[in-house]
Amino acid sequence: MKTRNLIATSSLALTMMLGIVATPLSAQQTYTPGVTVEKNTNPEWEADYTATFIYKDKDARDATNVSVSGGFQFYKPEEVQSFANTGDGANIPCYNAYQYQGGMFAGGYNLNGDAANYSMTEIEDEIFEVTIPLPANEYFYAFNIEYSDGSSETNVKDPANPALANDGSDAGWSLFYVGNGETKGQEYINPRTDGKTGTYSFVNYLAEDGTTQPLGIYLPNGYDANKTYKTIYVSHGGGGNEVEWMTIGAVPNIMDNLIADSLTKEAIVVTMDNTYFNWDYDRIINNLFNNILPYIETHYNVSKEVNDRAFCGLSMGSMTTTTLYQTHPDQFGYFGCFSGANVPVDVSKVAHLDQPNLYITAGCIDMALMNDSYNTASDRTTTGFVDKLNTLNLTNYKLEILNGAHDWYVWRESFTNFVKDHLWTKDVKIETPSETPVIKPETPASSTNTTTAPKTGDDLNLAVAGLFIIISVTTGVVIKKHY
């Protein structure tokens, strides 16, 4: 709340007259906007760390209330077991950060639709603060602001910790790390500090409709243009972009850690923007084979062997992955399908479905595990996809149900497991086709616009126990740590 400043023409005399000792400006409390992570010293909180958020409002309006929200919801594994059978989360308890207990897992949202919102205290004029306990992980957050004139702003990214962006596209939230990888499934997400790190950048290529589109490129530590590398192609979900996997998805950190610890082989990782194609799978696949792969194979020294390249994705990116698997199973040695599936063709008539390895995941309270499309012609669920594989007696897959929801906690763990435990394991060499297929979609929509991403994350409409929920989950970067 803004206050009027009164000017004292004789402040020293007034101070002496009232018997008050003036405090030098250098000794006054200062507040640094952003997030500060520290070890937890409050015995009433069970989490190992605390995160203190400080927001300084610079808007001309008078801020009266500020809160912070993000991936600060938690669940008990023993209380969510019914979801796998029913897809109903209406009666599953969700806990806030102050209620956190060891053994709980983080979720990006409340299954009942009301995300935890943490009110902040105004500690100085237009400066707001709150401290919450948190276990180790990577978290996303944003501020919600109410003004005295009745107006408000929601999901405001932290101006002191902006999300990394590429030409206007970003992960939609601010991001920070807590701890040192102590949380199961998130052991490899933190940045390395020993210099054994690769690089990532964003480049432009010519897409199938003639427009310039972006790619994210991760190169491993010590990248050598004269050395041949394996490749991992990775797709975001609905409303996302090429930036997300490189930031909230922590792909560079995961790859750095797994490579440095000799838990995987060196590989180049390529992210893309499939939102631009409005999830027209024919166009996406056409663009992949005729534009993205040729660009990568021209500009980087990568193997063209089928068993040296993989494709994976989350949610609608997983639907892209399963579509690609069912239409071109002989073009990649490995597919990672995280939280979603699509069955666009009669798979019983597709050859070579037993050729690649599949790693399939979903969260234990994931909308894509089982929802109202299960066992229907429009089934998009993980459960439905696995059932279809079983009807064909296919055994070249592994299914894992992970602790989490339809969110980045599950997807980071999925990518980690995919790279660490499932890639580059095939001993039998698959003969590489003489040339990659040229797929021509039916009358592709013309466009001369470059990519724009007004939304980020994975925006899906779903019905859960009769409640209509819109979920948008994503993130952004770290600030300070004191241990």
What positions do the PLM features span?
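Aromatic-rich carbohydrate-binding modules that target alpha-glucans
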Residues: 46, 50-137, 146-179
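A short loop-to-beta-strand scaffold at the N-terminal edge of the catalytic core in hydrolase folds
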Residues: 209-222
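Short substrate-entry loop that stabilizes the transition state in hydrolases
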Residues: 223-279
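Alpha/beta-hydrolase active-site loop
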Residues: 278-301
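Primarily recognizes the serine-hydrolase "nucleophile elbow" in alpha/beta-hydrolase
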Residues: 298, 304-354
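C-terminal catalytic histidine-bearing segment of alpha/beta-hydrolase fold enzymes
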Residues: 361, 367, 379-433
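C-terminal low-complexity, Ser/Thr- and acidic/Pro-rich disordered "stalk" regions positioned immediately N-terminal
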Residues: 428-456
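A cross-kingdom C-terminal cell-surface attachment/processing module
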Residues: 460-481
